[in-house]
């Protein structure tokens, strides 16, 4: 039985988005033969009800909307907007403590927007010589979605989508 940490931007409950539904179902299946903890960068905004029966522990960062805006303004030149939003050192410190304390076998990151945390996790694994498998579940190639979207958008959005596509291609 593996000890798995599932890392997501938003807590996967309530099931209001496709990302939440995917995460919920992944956690449900993983919990059948593994111990699953969840770390979400954003605090849950609803009672966790049904998902709790599949989780060992859940914890979250405390990133605020204001902080996400600041992160976008500070980091969007370096990375895609969706990724820049979650450049959060405080969340990384909380996640780092969890990883070191709980000795996970597997860490799963959901979605490319967690690029910052993924890079930090890889560095931590290498620095501390941790025996942890790291999986990145990117669903699909968001870079291709942005490139395709650029073909149908007006001038400003076309340029933004093209830029996002290029940045995401490098990340993916």
Locate each region found by the language model.
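N-terminal subdomain of nucleotide-sugar transferases
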Residues: 1-58, 100-102
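Histidine-centered beta-alpha loop that forms part of the nucleotide-sugar donor binding/catalytic region
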Residues: 9, 112, 138-141
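Short, conserved loop/helix-junction motifs that constitute active-site signature segments
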Residues: 30-31, 124-130
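A conserved catalytic-core segment of Leloir-type glycosyltransferases
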Residues: 38-98
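Short, charged/polar "capping" segments at the starts of alpha-helices
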Residues: 44-50, 116-118, 144
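Short, hinge-like loop/turn segments at secondary-structure boundaries
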Residues: 54-57, 125-126, 151-155
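Acceptor-binding helix/loop patch of EC 2.4 sugar-transfer enzymes
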Residues: 66-85, 135-170
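Short N-terminal targeting/anchoring amphipathic segment
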Residues: 95-116, 131-135
């Amino acid at each position: 039985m593996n000890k798995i940490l599932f890392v997501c931007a938003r807590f996967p409950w309530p099931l209001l988005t496709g990302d939440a539904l995917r995460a919920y179902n992944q956690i449900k299946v993983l919990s059948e033969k593994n111990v699953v903890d969840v770390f979400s960068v954003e605090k849950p905004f609803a009672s966790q009800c049904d998902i709790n029966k599949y989780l060992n522990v859940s914890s979250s960062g405390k990133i605020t909307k204001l902080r996400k805006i600041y992160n976008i303004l500070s980091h969007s030149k370096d990375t895609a907007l969706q990724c820049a939003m979650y450049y959060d050192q405080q969340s990384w410190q909380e996640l780092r403590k969890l990883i070191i304390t709980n000795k996970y076998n597997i860490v799963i990151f959901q979605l490319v927007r967690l690029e910052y945390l993924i890079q930090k996790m890889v560095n931590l694994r290498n620095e501390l010589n941790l025996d942890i498998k790291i999986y990145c579940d990117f669903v699909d190639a968001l870079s291709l979605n942005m490139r395709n979207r650029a073909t149908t958008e007006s001038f400003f959005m076309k340029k933004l989508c093209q830029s996002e596509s290029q940045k995401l291609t490098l990340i993916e």
